[in-house]
Regions:
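Nucleotide/phosphate-binding catalytic cleft detector across ATP-hydrolyzing
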Residues: 1-39, 47-58, 63-175, 188-311, ...
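Conserved Rossmann-like nucleotide-cofactor binding loop
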Residues: 42, 181-183
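Residue-level signal for beta-strand positions within conserved beta-sheet cores that form or flank
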Residues: 42, 71, 325
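Conserved phosphate-binding/catalytic loops in two-lobed NTP-binding clefts
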Residues: 138-153, 313-337
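Extended, Lys/Arg-enriched charged tracts that mediate electrostatic binding to polyanionic substrates
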Residues: 178
Length: 389
């Protein structure tokens, strides 16, 4: 579950006649160390955070809310390594994560909670699930493995600050999270994420070396180039002109979704989730870009990393100027790290209720799914659970 409230402190609560409830560690408040690990189609990185949770209300059964978030360490950003077109180099990713733990001064035993996510085109690789499951077990005590385009969109909206912006200004914000393999969209209304969607468009669908020789091509990259009338092959050179055409074409498709529901057959084919329903740009007060390509949209980074990121950033800026609504663009709190911040800082809630476990040594249990059981009149809990499962 995500925590959808602002960072805030609760006032001291009076109980009875003049008694004041203090912040007692473990009773009224506690702190957790959290990790967010993002293994993406373009880049991989992680963030360690410290979360402070305080109890809501005077009752000991009141639930805890995250009231403070503090980033303790940000790793470097590594280009996700591949052994082939279908395999991520798990050994190199392991070394990178382990070195980041050492550099931060943490061991897995120090980490209380967090999430490991694998995103975009990386999610389609043959060894994607074993990688996520390995890091979920290696990284700390209670780490969840999260994946899925809608969930990633949600995390990015929280991590980049779009949700906080929407809530603070009571406005509708569109978050566009642009990665290497996919772009995620979140519509945030008055601080609530009301719709999410994703499309198979990203800056690293085609990767190339310093001389322009193609080193990797994703299926969506081939499809897009074919629409432009070009073929692309690993080991063959791609010209700068074709790179620019490719980047501009992807930006055009993205802005089809920014302005309305997808209308072209190509955009519909590239969707990896259902699109927004009953959506028009006229609803939106602000647009916030996040993800790796956002660093180029806001011109924070002009470096090419063997993909069309800088060209795509320029094309996005050009399309923004053509929109009928002006002054929509706002800056994110986090750009390339939006999803990993969301994973590390917005994936925890704590209940104030207690549960009895006869053998606590069985914990932690990994990979448990959350289900919603709807109870009808006179229906047994067992029947409701069986139906939900």
């Amino acid at each position: 579950l995500h925590d959808d409230d602002f960072e805030h402190d609760h006032p001291e609560l009076e109980i009875g006649s003049g008694a004041v409830l203090e912040d007692i560690e473990g009773l009224e408040m506690f702190t957790l160390k959290s990790v967010g690990i993002d293994i993406g189609s373009s880049t991989s990185h992680l963030v360690f955070s410290q979360l402070t949770l305080r109890r809501e209300g005077a009752s000991l059964s009141g639930r805890f809310r995250v009231t403070e978030r503090k980033v303790l360490y940000r790793s470097g950003i590594m280009l996700t390594p591949y052994l082939s077109g279908t395999l991520i180099d798990i050994d190199r990713v392991k070394r990178f994560i382990e070195e980041a733990y050492k550099e931060a001064g943490f061991s897995p035993e120090d980490i209380d909670t967090g999430a490991v996510i694998i995103t975009g085109e990386a999610l389609k690789k043959e060894n994607a699930r074993p990688i996520v499951e390995y890091f979920a077990k290696y990284s700390g005590k209670f780490i969840c493995a999260a994946a899925g385009h809608n969930h990633e969109a949600l995390l990015a909206a929280y991590g980049c600050g779009a949700v906080d912006l929407s809530k603070a200004e009571r406005k509708t914000v569109l978050n566009v999270d642009m990665g290497g393999g996919t772009t995620k969209f979140s519509l945030v209304e008055n601080g609530v994420v009301t719709q999410t969607a994703a499309i198979n468009v990203g800056a690293r669908l085609i990767a190339f070396d310093d001389s322009g020789v193609v080193t990797r091509v994703e299926d969506a990259g081939r499809t897009l180039m074919q629409e432009l009338g070009y073929t692309v092959e690993i080991g063959k050179k791609i010209t700068k002109k074709r790179m620019e055409e490719f980047a501009a074409f992807m930006a055009k498709i993205l802005f089809e979704l920014v302005e309305r529901e997808p209308s072209s057959s190509l955009a519909k084919r590239l969707m990896v989730t259902p699109p927004f329903a009953n959506y028009r740009l006229s609803q939106v007060d602000h647009i916030v870009f996040s993800g790796g390509v956002s660093e180029h949209v806001y011109e924070r980074d002009r470096t090419s990393y063997g993909d069309v990121g800088p060209m795509m950033g320029k094309s996005v800026r050009d399309y923004l100027k053509k929109l009928p609504k002006k002054r929509l663009l706002r800056e994110p709190l986090e750009g390339i790290r939006a999803t990993v911040i969301g994973a590390g800082e917005y994936t925890v809630q704590a209940s104030g209720n207690t549960s009895y476990i006869s053998n606590p040594k069985v914990l932690p249990v990994f990979g448990l799914k959350v289900i919603r059981a709807s109870l009808g009149p006179g229906q047994s809990i067992i029947d409701a659970l069986n139906r939900s499962l």
